[in-house]
Amino acid sequence: MSLAVVFLLGFLAVSHGQQAGTETEEYHLPLTWERDGSSVSASVVIDSNWRWTHSTEDTTNCYDGNEWDSTLCPDADTCTENCAIDGVDQGTWGDTYGITASGSKLTLSFVTEGEYSTDIGSRVFLMADDDNYEIFNLLDKEFSFDVDASNLPCGLNGALYFVSMDEDGGTSKYSTNTAGAKYGTGYCDAQCPHDMKFIAGKANSDGWTPSDNDQNAGTGEMGACCHEMDIWEANSQAQSYTAHVCSVDGYTPCTGTDCGDNGDDRYKGVCDKDGCDYAAYRLGQHDFYGEGGTVDSGSTLTVITQFITGGGGLNEIRRIYQQGGQTIQNAAVNFPGDVDPYDSITEDFCVDIKRYFGDTNDFDAKGGMSGMSNALKKGMVLVMSLWDDHYANMLWLDATYPVDSTEPGALRGPCSTDSGDPADVEANFPGSTVTFSNIKIGPIQSYD
């Protein structure tokens, strides 16, 4: 998930490689959540990709705009040695990143104009302690949270999801990474993102290509791949939950074909980029979610996801909603030729939705529900983010995509195919926000 931030002032540091600078003391934003009925006092850390990347010797920017400094970074090894990331203090959370928290409530703002910076979107991870991410084991568990997506227009995505990041952010694997989870290192997902400034403890500067439509981002030769369980990708118009699997275990750097980049290599990589998705609008239930819908995006709602095994491996990912004192079962769908409707993600559902929509079943090819089960058993890190889409304008979530298609499954939401241009949403909807709260994990409950 590609997000962007630009800073106009650097910080002083005295470290080498993907290590933490010492000028600014790191502060993690407090956030409470609930495990098995007991409150947990925890915190979140901001992704290292949002941090200032600068020379270890002075305040010279290693990364400026969407390019690496050619003197400090003539090659990746030299860049890794010359450049460092720095801490985020308490005031920077709100003033620079537009992120605030109170109790169990976390609010992410879209565009934040700080004294020295303009921040676009954000991505944070839940911590277990100062140096490690919280690892969630979701099999035979129920995960729930409240979300207010009412202030997210077409083209934005307020997401909550799990990925197979390393608990320590990669410090035990990569000797050049000593910043670790404390500084938000080690992000990965099933898209094998190339926009990470550091991957596997090394600067991703080799082959770096600045984006032609994002003044803050670019792509390097390396990508960072891992399993991804999208619990919630949504704005006020559309939503989905999606399982993505990979043929590799855990955090895996990639290059070349293994990254499965868009185009001819998309299905040749190590991860399933399409995923097996359950999206009510795409499945024909156009009145189920949205402003004034059965699940009304105009007010806060509770999202419940159950990971059911039946005593074995994962066999069902079930979705339930609560709003206004009512329990709302997930929208059901019938595919032609099926006797019984589906209302959850199962192996059979994934086969049938790919068949009906004519999509490549890369989910099955990369491991299917068994692969997802293995990833959940090993544990995953919780991510919350707000972003716009410089590749496809978020049309895959809330509009018709591909834009000229009339085939089943192309209609994914009510938004116009002209919507979602990042330049437009950043200029016209800078005050957009998403709020997550009341995060809980516990035994599976009955909601009949």
Curated annotation (Swiss-Prot):
Subcellular location: Secreted
GO biological process: cellulose catabolic process
Residue positions where Pyrrolidone carboxylic acid is found in the record: 18
GO CC annotations, alphabetized: extracellular region
Tissue: Highly expressed in the hepatopancreas (at protein level). Little or no expression detected in the hindgut or the rest of the body (at protein level).
Enzyme nomenclature, EC number: 3.2.1.91
pH-dependence of activity, as noted: Optimum pH is 4-6.5 for p-nitrophenyl-beta-d-cellotrioside (pNP-G3), and 4-8 for p-nitrophenyl-beta-d-cellopentaoside (pNP-G5).
Keywords, alphabetical: Carbohydrate metabolism, Cellulose degradation, Disulfide bond, Glycosidase, Hydrolase, Polysaccharide degradation, Pyrrolidone carboxylic acid, Secreted, Signal
Entry keyword Disulfide bond: yes
Positions of transmembrane segments: none
GO MF term (any one): cellulose 1,4-beta-cellobiosidase activity
Enzymatic reactions: Hydrolysis of (1->4)-beta-D-glucosidic linkages in cellulose and cellotetraose, releasing cellobiose from the non-reducing ends of the chains
InterPro entries listed in its UniProt record: ConA-like_dom_sf, Glyco_hydro_7, Glyco_hydro_7_sf
Disulfide bonds: 62-83, 73-79, 154-415, 188-226, 192-225, 246-271, 254-259, 276-350
More info: Unlike most wood-boring animal species, which rely on symbiotic microbes for digestion of woody substrates, the L.quadripunctata genome contains a range of enzymes (including GH7B) capable of lignocellulose digestion.
Family of this protein: Belongs to the glycosyl hydrolase 7 (cellulase C) family.
Subunit structure: Monomer.
Protein role: Exocellobiohydrolase (CBH) that catalyzes the hydrolysis of 1,4-beta-D-glucosidic bonds in cellulose to release the disaccharide cellobiose. The degradation of cellulose involves an interplay between different cellulolytic enzymes. Hydrolysis starts with endoglucanases (EGs), which cut internal beta-1,4-glucosidic bonds in cellulose to reduce the polymerization degree of the substrate and create new chain ends for exocellobiohydrolases (CBHs). The CBHs release the disaccharide cellobiose from the non-reducing end of the cellulose polymer chain.
Protein known as: Exoglucanase GH7B
Biological source species: Limnoria quadripunctata
